Amino acid sequence: MTKQDQEMPTKYHPQDIESKWYEYWIEGKFFEATSDETKKPYTIVIPPPNVTGKLHLGHAWDTALQDILSRLKRMQGYDTLWLPGMDHAGIATQAKVEAKLREEGKSRYDLGREAFVEKTWEWKEEYADFIRQQWAKLGLSLDYSRERFTLDEGLSKAVREVFVKLYEKGLIYRGEYIINWDPVTKTALSDIEVIYKDVQGYFYHMKYPLADGDGAIEVATTRPETMLGDTAVAVHPEDERYQHLIGKMVKLPITGREIPIVADDYVDMEFGSGAVKITPAHDPNDFEIGNRHNLPRILVMNEDGTMNEKAGQYEGMDRFECRKQIVKDLQEQGVLFKIEEHVHSVGHSERSGAVVEPYLSTQWFVKMKPLAEQAIELQTTENKVNFVPDRFEKTYLRWMENIRDWCISRQLWWGHRIPAWYHKETGEVYVGHEAPQDIDNWKQDEDVLDTWFSSALWPFSTMGWPDEEAPDYKRYYSTDALVTGYDIIFFWVSRMIFQGLEFTGQPPFKDVLIHGLVRDAEGQKMSKSLGNGVDPMEVIDKYGADALRFFLATGSSPGNDLRFYWEKVESTWNFGNKIWNASRFALMNMDGMSYDEIDLTGEKSIADQWILTRLQETIETVTRLIDAYEFGEVGRHLYNFIWDDLCDWYIEMAKLPLYGEDEVAKKTTRSVLAYVLDQTMRLLHPLMPFITEEIWQHLPHEGESITVASWPVKSEEFTFEQAMGDMELLKDIIRSVRNTRAELNVPMSKEIELHIQAKNEDVLTQLERGKHYIEKFCNPSTLVMGTAIEKPEKSMSNVLSGVELYLPLAGLLDLEEEIARLEKEENKLEKEVERVQKKLSNQGFLAKAPEKVIEEERKKEADYLEKRAAVRARIKELKG
């Protein structure tokens, strides 16, 4: 699809080029891993997005970084696999489908399990297509021939294998335990699916009367509705206040049920009254105390958060309505004697927002300690997972060291059905890859597995495991890098590591690059409730994918959050526009040059040598920084090289030979320009793939696509140290003269007299080599250069490294008029200095004004003083 013979469009319109190139790349199969044994493999698996809707800016950021790595490695000659896929997202997807059914006046129970799951598969297909369209608009170089879904048969086989193996090792068990229960979605939640928020609540202080009528014992709770399930009161065995009561019974208010006073070391004697009500079915700590003392477990709530038959007169009431009523009843009985305001941390469901209920339930669990221990041990070996930035390794280890057993069963229909069956008569439990042969005598467990159970197997289940001879598993596992946000280190990263170690004997990835969250311009997290979210597709429609990608890749340092600014995306579009215009100019002056005509052997100008050297430095720096995941620095170096060195300096200097009469110099400059643009497009390609492909196809080139063009390698042949020194001196001189012209309002078209005093003969030789550039870009009527030049009268001077510049002012401006103008400016600044200093010496102002306001005044003072000094120096210079 070469476009070398076609002229580039005048204007840069990303929308005109982006979709066509993605189609071209897909049709050309440039992104497909080749399994070429002569190449070293490089593998990344995409963190699979949920099939619940649109991708957000966080997805765009995450995938942009992965695409940079994938495109780089592909160009470096690796057999690169970037494996795409999606997550079934059990609870999230089921909630979406149920909401859609409610709009039709139906529930999942109206459909039945099989029909509901079928309906959810239809949802998945619709949204999977939508996600692929978004991936395409982002320009992601994914190998779609290997796309996976967490409910694919291959992945389901891996899930069953892992469940069965862990069960056989005693690492998966079924037990009654206090779990986090979401009464809205009616399912268990793992600890990390619970969001804790500080809530204004109350401590309710009650007195439980002793059964023998001899006094009462004081307890307190934030959840008085749970008292209906109390089965004991606990005190510390060494608490002298209560030692005589241990073993006695108290009468539970309202119910009249008698419960014992037990002694347990868990109780904090210093907190409250030192006596604690024990509700084993509704609190994890009480559950443990109950186990130690063989206490009964009385569950007083239904799964939907209403009170059950064990709650007696409160049966059927919502838990919070019950709380209000029970408080009222306890007050009437004289049992509740104090209500104290209390801010405490309350768990909420990440998915529904409901207050989570600690709830006694029979669930499936993974015994975590043995699995966590080997993951912790890994980090002491050479084979450790490298966290970038490394501070996140401590976060990861701290969580692993304090890990609790993982509740993996979910009361849902969408997901991996737990491969366990119960015998209808004997109750025997059977766990296996397939159902028992006499299936009529068995009933399968109704629950599905936590979504993160299958996600934890993603790096190897997608490669064909448990078939360890599967070609992709043998070649591409383990993977090289994982890119993900710090918010799912616990949910996902840690679980992939311990499952990878347990089932493959090696970590699932070498490096983990951690990025932060995308926030709005004020630093707030983007959310639906705040209405501050930004759709990446909207950004692409306005500015193009390249602008968004460059902004996302370069807008933050590793591990930190990224603030989204529309203005910054616009500035990256401007960067693309600058590249477009520079490339268009270059192509217009290449006179139809072919790739074979590029000849870099001829004599090169200072500018040619300098840009070639700067290119080599940029190649070395950019390659090193990408390998170190320093994408922000990559962007900064590329931006500076392209905008400043290539566009603002070299292309301007290249116009001298291009518009000149020397055909040999013209041909060399064309060759240098073609070569530098080609190499620059390759360097920029991983960050801005569309514009670089478009420009590269117009340039003299060989090969089908820049996506598979070789990555630039630093060449000592094109490193010219002398030209670097010459060019820096020339740039300093040209900049200085331009700045002075601007200060004096002398246009570039007006000739000036320029005297340059060189520090020594070496510097003078440099000046002689670059004289034609000084003449072109400073526009002097007279240029005097030497090592013993006297400063002309009434001249401006500027001291630079190695030289001093003198600009005689006679004829350039009316000296008397300019001095008068500057003296007027000096008087104005003097008044501002007096005003601000008077304010800063006012003790009343300093005592009352906010620190920020005082700091602003101090900055003003420094600014005015600096400007006044500059004006005074200029007046002195003009007066001679």
From Swiss-Prot:
GO terms for cellular component: cytosol. It catalyses: tRNA(Val) + L-valine + ATP = L-valyl-tRNA(Val) + AMP + diphosphate. A motif ('KMSKS' region) lies at residues 525-529. ATP binds at residue 528. A motif ('HIGH' region) lies at residues 49-59. One of its GO terms (molecular function) is aminoacyl-tRNA deacylase activity. Residues 809-879 form a coiled coil. Its EC number is 6.1.1.9. Keywords: Aminoacyl-tRNA synthetase, ATP-binding, Coiled coil, Cytoplasm, Ligase, Nucleotide-binding, Protein biosynthesis. One of its GO terms (biological process) is valyl-tRNA aminoacylation. It is found in: Cytoplasm. Monomer. Belongs to the class-I aminoacyl-tRNA synthetase family. ValS type 1 subfamily. Catalyzes the attachment of valine to tRNA(Val). As ValRS can inadvertently accommodate and process structurally similar amino acids such as threonine, to avoid such errors, it has a 'posttransfer' editing activity that hydrolyzes mischarged Thr-tRNA(Val) in a tRNA-dependent manner. ValRS has two distinct active sites: one for aminoacylation and one for editing. The misactivated threonine is translocated from the active site to the editing site. This is Valine--tRNA ligase. It comes from Halalkalibacterium halodurans (strain ATCC BAA-125 / DSM 18197 / FERM 7344 / JCM 9153 / C-125). The gene is valS.
